[in-house]
């Protein structure tokens, strides 16, 4: 159970440091959380890379992507302010296959401006208010992002990129990966 901004940030830092138990954990919010003044670190962010090859996009999943269950229990996370020049931007960085995220509203501002964007060649950045990337096989239901998102590369109000599991030949969605979710900005 998570009830404070400190507990939420601690969870993100454990996942991003490679703690597999944390990455596969089962989390539930017990109250609304205000992130005002918190130096946020997207959940499951480091190592996500996007490769552009002949105008066809493939997602490459990081080992630190969120792979567990996150139940917002109808609560809100407010005050998110995240800006980066070097990595994926969103409340979640990468929601990996088999992960489930549900019943959560996030409010805030997400900005991704890689300083070397034009020099990246085949690499790019992803930015989305709720998640930078959602990988096929993940389930995100009844989640909402209220705020603003700005960036280069693959950018979306709710999610920046819906990408394929690298083990699959093509992107096939057997059932909706993102269901009953909204963006207001």
What are these regions (language model features)?
Residues 1-185:
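Surface-exposed repetitive/solenoidal architectures
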């Amino acid at each position: 159970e998570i009830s404070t901004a400190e507990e939420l940030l601690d969870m993100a830092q454990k996942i991003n440091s490679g703690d597999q138990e944390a990455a596969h954990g089962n989390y539930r919010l017990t109250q609304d959380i205000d992130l005002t003044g918190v130096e946020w670190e997207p959940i499951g962010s480091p190592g996500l890379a996007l490769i552009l090859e002949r105008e066809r996009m493939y997602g490459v999943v990081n080992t630190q992507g969120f792979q567990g269950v996150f139940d917002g229990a109808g609560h809100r996370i407010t005050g998110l302010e995240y800006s980066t020049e070097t990595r994926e931007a969103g409340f979640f960085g990468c929601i990996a296959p088999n992960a489930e995220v549900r019943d959560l509203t996030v409010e805030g501002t997400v900005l991704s401006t890689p300083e070397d964007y034009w020099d990246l060649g085949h690499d790019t950045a992803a930015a989305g208010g709720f998640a930078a990337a959602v990988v096929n096989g993940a389930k995100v239901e009844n989640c909402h992002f209220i705020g603003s998102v700005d960036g280069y590369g693959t950018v979306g109000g709710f999610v920046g990129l819906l990408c394929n599991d690298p083990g699959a030949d093509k992107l096939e969605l057997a059932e909706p990966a993102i269901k009953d979710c909204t963006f207001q900005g």
